[in-house]
Structure formats: C-alpha cells, structure tokens
UniProtKB/Swiss-Prot annotation:
A Pfam family: UPF0262
Family per similarity comment: Belongs to the UPF0262 family.
Source organism (scientific name): Rhodospirillum rubrum (strain ATCC 11170 / ATH 1.1.1 / DSM 467 / LMG 4362 / NCIMB 8255 / S1)
Lineage: Bacteria, Pseudomonadati, Pseudomonadota, Alphaproteobacteria, Rhodospirillales
InterPro entries xref list: UCP032146
Protein name: UPF0262 protein Rru_A2770
Length: 161
C-alpha cells in the first residue's frame, strides 16, 4: 500500500501513550503532547495493507524499541509494529537540545531570534518524520504531516521530568 492508495477511512481516531511510559513532564512537553495528539486527530492519514480504518493507536517504548499497537475502531488488536529506536536517537537528542533553547528563547530573546530557533526545530521535525515514514514503509503508510506529529510523540515518550 502506498500513500496514494489511502482511503478516506484510513486514519487514526484515537491515540494513546502507554501509561507504563507516562511520567510527570514539564508543562512545555505536555503542551507539545497535547497539540500533537489534537492535530493528529484533526487531520491524519494512516493505513495498513489488508485492513480498513479507522484505527486506534497505542505508542510505547520497551527495551529500546518503539511499539505501535494498532487496533481497529472498536479496539480489536490488528497488528503490532516494532521499530528500533537507534535511527531516532541523534534526532531526538538534537530535538531536545533545540527545544531547551526554544523554551529559554521565548522568555528573553527577540522574535527574530525565536523564529530562527523555531526554524531549526521544524527542520528536525521534518527529519524525524522522514525517518519514521521510512522505517514504517511496508508496514504502515502515513503522510508527511502524520509522520511529523508521530515523531513529536516519540520525543514525548523519551522526555523525563
């Protein structure tokens, strides 16, 4: 299945982060999580060959792996996709560093300086989304924006404190 083959029903109607991986996070990280989930549920393209949407998704981290627990609209398990976290490590690390700069900048820097940092943050989002889309190829089909928002949630799962 390719992105062009997605049907109107091929989308996510619910996204959860596994409670085992849930920790109390900084307000800025919680805001990122809430915005990513809201935006995903408003507009996403998510499909699996051999299954018709809509889908529910539970994301979790376990043993250095990212787990996509994909279910149908009535919460019946359909497929689990497990990805190595190794390809994401540097991007996630860089993303956290630039987010720290961004959160500091919004308190004290000029709008032009904040915009420059935000452009770097968006660039890392694009890179992380592209890596995710590539790693999901052959298993799950997502569009660019869906991949970017899912990458945000991968970063949230990595966030501590």
């Amino acid at each position: 299945m390719e992105e062009g083959e997605l049907k109107d029903t091929d989308h996510l109607i619910d996204i959860q982060l596994d409670e085992v991986t849930f920790v109390r996070r900084r307000p800025e990280v919680e805001h990122e999580r809430a915005v990513a989930i809201f935006d995903l549920l408003e507009d996403n393209h998510f499909g699996i060959k051999g299954f018709q949407g809509p889908f529910r998704l539970v994301l979790s981290l376990a043993e250095n792996r990212l787990l996509f627990d994909i279910r149908d609209g009535e919460d019946k398990p359909l497929r689990k996709v497990i990805l190595s976290l190794r390809p994401f490590r540097m991007i996630v690390k860089d993303y956290f560093m630039i987010c720290e700069s961004y959160f500091s900048a919004i308190r004290s820097m000029t709008p032009a300086q904040i915009e420059a940092i935000d452009m770097g943050r968006r660039g890392l989002h694009n890179e992380g989304g592209a890596v995710l889309k590539e790693r999901l190829a052959g298993k799950v089909v997502v569009d660019h924006d869906t991949a970017r928002r899912l990458f945000t949630l991968i970063c949230v799962l990595h966030a501590r404190g």
